[in-house]
Amino acid sequence: MLIEHLNRQLREREAQSLRRRRRIAETPCAPHQRVSLDGQTASEARELLAFCSNDYLGLANHPALIGALAEGARLWGAGAGASHLISGHTRAHAALEDTLAEWAAPNIPGAKALSFCTGYMANLALLTALGDAEATLFADKLNHASLVDGALLAKAKLQRYAHRQFDVLERQLAACTTPIKLIVTDAVFSMDGDLAELDQLLSLAERFDAWLVIDDAHGFGVLGPKGRGSLAHFGLRSERLILMGTLGKAAGLGGAFVAAHPSVIDWLVQSARAYIYTTAAPPAIAHALSASLALIAGDEGEARRQHLRELIAALRCQLAALIAAQPQLGWRLAESDTAIQPLIVGSNDSALALAAALDAQGLWVPAIRPPTVPVGTARLRITLSAAHSQADVTRLVAALATTARELA
């Protein structure tokens, strides 16, 4: 009965062009990768120009980080061996947390930091630990799935507001009667690339005695002076801020952290099940992240951010011209100044066909469909990396232009 039930649902997904399939990267994360399909051998792989990773600064295959990771393994071995609260919390983890609190969260007075294996786990831990029965969570409807799941698992009341509609949020806050209020938002929205107006949200938090929980997965390392992230980008400073950042995107490695008032961090240690009941990340990764943060903050990091900004501007300019020349296609480039550049095409079939046409021309750009994005807004999620070149961007737009002419 179970298998029949699952197969029926799989067929339904297939009919709606919603079935997901994995590819196998045969080479390290980089703009040019050899890629095979699930079921193929490595010898059948093709080289593709990829616009799909979140390696925004191009650090995932950086020699300095490879060396730091190898050094960390020599110093600390292959794994942590236990959870943080048993025997898995090493000096490497502690040093990373101290650095993150000081470097990534100077906007939060007296902040402490707590490291996690993934951003998903960090958000689940955060919202389930803070969102008890005395709390209300106010969440943007386009928040990342991990924030959605954390809010649903929490015992708190949940109120969602339309994307960046702060007049709605203001009315919800004004009507709230619970003693604890948490406004929860992405800083950079992962499927649209736009920024939440964090300054306005903090103003509402201060006005209504609420706390602002920020998922800076796609801003950390990229935005703000020295890549310190979205808090620095907006120049915010308040003890009402609770920051989650990931370390597997711009930082090039893996893991995540929460930075907040010391009492918030202590409460997570005491009660966050997604922190307590899982093995700590390998300490070698924590060791290597120190090298990553130094790169991000230094001259090389700034040069990479500047190059990334130039790539974003070039892509937007070229795509705008292409869309203007082919209005009958109905393509729309989302309003985004970040490395996430969504090309919205509408139907699931259209997005899949466009991705397949690019694949045939040697480009890897993923089609994103519901439920990840709203129905009718299927898209290509183009992501740029500082490891890309201007020639890579030109090649992508040329391939899209070729496909546009064929569709016309």
Swiss-Prot record:
Cite the GO molecular-function annotations of the record.
8-amino-7-oxononanoate synthase activity; pyridoxal phosphate binding
What's the name of the protein? 8-amino-7-oxononanoate synthase
E.C. no: 2.3.1.47
Q: Kindly report, in one word, the top-level EC class recorded for this enzyme.
A: transferase
Report residues binding pyridoxal 5'-phosphate: 119-120, 190, 218, 246
Which cofactors?
A: pyridoxal 5'-phosphate
Pathway given for this chain reads:
Cofactor biosynthesis; biotin biosynthesis
Annotated family: Belongs to the class-II pyridoxal-phosphate-dependent aminotransferase family. BioF subfamily.
Q: What does this protein do?
A: Catalyzes the decarboxylative condensation of pimeloyl-[acyl-carrier protein] and L-alanine to produce 8-amino-7-oxononanoate (AON), [acyl-carrier protein], and carbon dioxide.
UniProt superkingdom: Bacteria
Q: How does it assemble?
A: Homodimer.
Provide the residue positions that the database annotates as binding substrate.
20, 144, 372
**PANTHER family associated with the record:** 8-AMINO-7-OXONONANOATE SYNTHASE, CLASS II AMINOTRANSFERASE/8-AMINO-7-OXONONANOATE SYNTHASE
Catalysed reactions, as listed in the record: 6-carboxyhexanoyl-[ACP] + L-alanine + H(+) = (8S)-8-amino-7-oxononanoate + holo-[ACP] + CO2
GO BP terms: biotin biosynthetic process
Q: Which InterPro entries match?
A: Aminotransferase_I/II_large, AON_synthase_class-II, AONS_Archaea/Proteobacteria, AONS_Proteobacteria, PyrdxlP-dep_Trfase, PyrdxlP-dep_Trfase_major, PyrdxlP-dep_Trfase_small
**Pfam families per the UniProt record, alphabetical:** Aminotran_1_2
Question: Which keywords label this protein?
Answer: Biotin biosynthesis, Pyridoxal phosphate, Transferase
